[in-house]
């Protein structure tokens, strides 16, 4: 059995880790970095870029560069948060055929699961390169507050990337696993996880290798991206005030502003002031315009104060659901890059009444925890038991549109719960089971996960038939629902799939696309390599012809020059095999030149050989003597 890897699929950055013996290890990517930007881009010629290469070209290619895609995963196009996101990103968010939010580039639509799969593929390749063997299984993390549709979409992304997702694990729980793996002391901890796009807080009890989640809460649309956007809004407002030009309509300018905002935010975690300089940000009739202004930490904190405060209410709810007070928390663990901000640390300290623990790397701890869970599933990590919870209540719509809960939030998973319902009308022969997830009292205010019909119920007065509805939540937090007519034992079971969501056929098509793209990427890489070889050979051959061309016949020299011309012509095309053939022809034609170079070097070396011989002849007149430098003090000692 191959290694199971742990992947933190983040909004801003992703990270992959693996167990090496009893210790988890974060794996560096091809660029030598321990985290990879969760960014995917398509170039003019259709090449796909993932990670740092995609991030580097974002400024010049904003409409084809997809970032923060995790905010769209498992969401419908009509979701208010999707509509909000449309105004924040330079790329196009379109309605998918299934009603979900998809993205579009050059007229081609991609599901968020598909874009996420490209990042997961990069993580998979990073691990394979390090391990030297194929990787087919993974544990992938998600925000604790992700609903069923978002979890299912993440699992689909893994499948598209060629990974069997053995477990979907909550990010704060993964962080707690990493934090508590070597800790001997039992206690209650709070994991405060403020990442690039999402916020979670979980309360856990840890002791004797048991990690029990008592409660979780959060906001799946609150993170570092929002902090960056506040700085961008401030910069555009200031520029408009000074220059009278609105930069919000200029996608290239916005992308530059976004990068500058992120950089300024990071700098303000250690400095009290930073300078933002963006020359040639735009131009008008009077000429080019430059943006230059100073941003203080105090000003930045005032811009984002409400975002920081928004994290406190979920903390309050999580403590209440866990039945503990802030003073009963033994340790507060900070996770996610945004927790490096001093103001965030200050607010957390004020709320929990204690200095937060900063001993874990907030960018890597989640991937490390995922690797630990992978080790548990593989049997490499012993004596660790993880008990997680479902973040949101689950139930069905009953008469009058009421939301009837079957499983309450923060119930330990896996879990199974049944309840008997009946018909609302006389002689009703079918019922529609509509499954919702959320905390509101009316079904319509919660998230519709899916629906199905149970048909063939024998005619009977209302309230007589007995329909047993069973909810089954697996360890991934993914829901299965069964409805059974107890009179006929007729049963209907579904794995809940969001009213949108990807069908098995969609996923299969995307898997095939991913495989085809992998083949295309391989061919593109091969083409670059053979072109490089061809160009190097031309350069080396031309240099040799300049030096030794007079040592070969005119016919041989002519053959070499023809072969160079033919290879140059081939290099202008895209035919790798053709370039290989012409490279080979040039190598064959250059053989005579190689012989001439070898002969010339032999001739040049001959006088040197004679000289060596004459030295040997005089050897008898030379007296060999060993000598040694002796320190003055050493000499006195010896005397």
From Swiss-Prot:
UniProt xrefs under Gene3D superfamilies: 1.20.1270.10, 3.30.420.40, Actin, Chain A, domain 4, Substrate Binding Domain Of DNAk, Chain A, domain 1
InterPro entries: ATPase_NBD, Chaperone_DnaK, Heat_shock_70_CS, HSP70_C_sf, HSP70_peptide-bd_sf, Hsp_70_fam
GO molecular function, one term: ATP binding
Amino acid composition bias (Acidic residues), ranges on this chain: 623-632
CDD domains: ASKHA_NBD_HSP70_HSPA9
Phosphothreonine modified-residue sites: 198
PANTHER family given in the database record: HEAT SHOCK PROTEIN 70KDA
Name of protein: Chaperone protein DnaK
Gene: dnaK
